[in-house]
Design a protein with these regions (language model features):
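Conserved mid-core segment of classical short-chain dehydrogenase/reductases
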Residues: 86-99, 142-145, 184
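Amphipathic alpha-helical dimer-interface segment in Rossmann-like NAD(P)H-dependent oxidoreductases
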Residues: 69, 73, 105-125, 162
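Conserved glycine-rich cofactor-binding loop
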Residues: 12-13
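Residue(s) in the substrate-gating loop at a strand-loop-helix junction
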Residues: 133
Length: 229
């Protein structure tokens, strides 16, 4: 029997890691695309079965294409979860060209991975899950560039929905609020450890996401907004 595969980007830490861990426990084969070789090696050791890691940059078109074609040879690609992201929190006058390029990596990777998965699947029988942020729904002080990239991801997600309406390609937008993960480690000037400790547990968020994308054969949950208490 052909194995069902969930591809995820950015699955080595935080919410991505929790999705990997829980999805394996639910019987899926996971293929993780991420750039951190050291973290990937730890996951290779931790998940010795039903898991395969691909180390590389999801903004590299050749890496994405080669990886997804290799994955297609392993079984049935059923889900694509775009979870990778980078953030930069500064005052509006402080952003640089490098900040823009770094922040846009998530959007570029989302587009490249989705495009290649759609090609391999011949635009059929694929569920695309784009994990963004509540910042994709509103503007936040101190998050001008982050909001801009998330609004771009949301625009791409909504356009995909229209493009594949009435087909077997389903598109889900996920909009979680702040989570207590290492995402904030490089932005402690913006969010302190004390503050992030009050944010949502990524384990709970991963459970909500997987419950909604895996459990219902007769319906599709189009959008999920997850707010912290």
């Amino acid at each position: 029997m052909e194995k069902d595969i969930l591809i995820i980007t950015g699955g080595c830490s935080g919410l991505g890691f929790e999705i990997v861990r829980q999805a394996i426990a639910r019987g899926l084969f996971i293929c993780n695309l991420a750039r951190n070789k050291e973290k990937m090696e730890k996951l290779d050791s931790l998940f010795q079965s039903n898991y395969k890691g691909f180390v590389g940059d999801i903004t590299d078109e050749k890496f994405v294409s080669d990886s997804i074609h290799q994955i297609a040879a392993l079984g049935n690609i059923k889900y694509l979860v775009n979870c990778a992201e980078k953030a930069c929190f500064k005052k509006p006058v402080e952003y640089t060209s490098e900040d823009v390029n770094t922040s846009l990596a998530g959007l570029k990777g989302m587009v490249l991975c989705t495009t290649e998965a759609l090609k391999v699947k011949e635009e059929s029988n694929l569920k695309i899950v784009n994990i963004m942020s509540s910042a994709a729904l509103k503007g936040n002080k101190g998050e001008a560039l982050y909001c801009a990239t998330k609004w771009g991801e949301r625009g791409y997600t909504e356009s995909l929905k229209e493009a594949y309406k009435g087909t077997t390609v389903k598109v889900i937008g996920i909009y979680p609020g702040g989570m207590n993960t290492e995402f904030w480690d490089e932005s402690r000037h913006y969010v302190t450890e004390e503050k992030s400790s009050t944010f949502m547990n990524p384990k709970d968020v991963a459970t909500v996401i997987l419950d909604n994308i895996l459990n219902y054969s007769s319906l599709n949950v189009a959008d999920i907004k997850i707010e912290r208490n």
